[in-house]
From Swiss-Prot:
Keyword Secreted attached: yes
Keyword Secreted included in the entry's annotation: yes
Subcellular location: Secreted, Cell wall
GO cellular component: extracellular region
Protein name: 65 kDa cell wall protein
Protein source organism: Nicotiana tabacum
UniProtKB keywords: Cell wall, Secreted
Domain of life: Eukaryota
Length: 11
Protein backbone atom coordinates (compact mmCIF):
# COMPACT_ATOMS: atom_id res chain seq x y z
CA UNK A 1 0.00 0.00 0.00
CA UNK A 2 1.17 3.58 -0.63
CA UNK A 3 2.69 5.67 2.18
CA UNK A 4 0.48 8.02 4.27
CA UNK A 5 -0.40 11.26 2.49
CA UNK A 6 -0.41 9.51 -0.91
CA UNK A 7 -3.45 8.99 -3.16
CA UNK A 8 -4.95 6.84 -0.41
CA UNK A 9 -5.31 9.94 1.60
CA UNK A 10 -3.59 8.74 4.57
CA UNK A 11 -2.98 11.46 7.17
Amino acid sequence: MPPPGSKSXGT
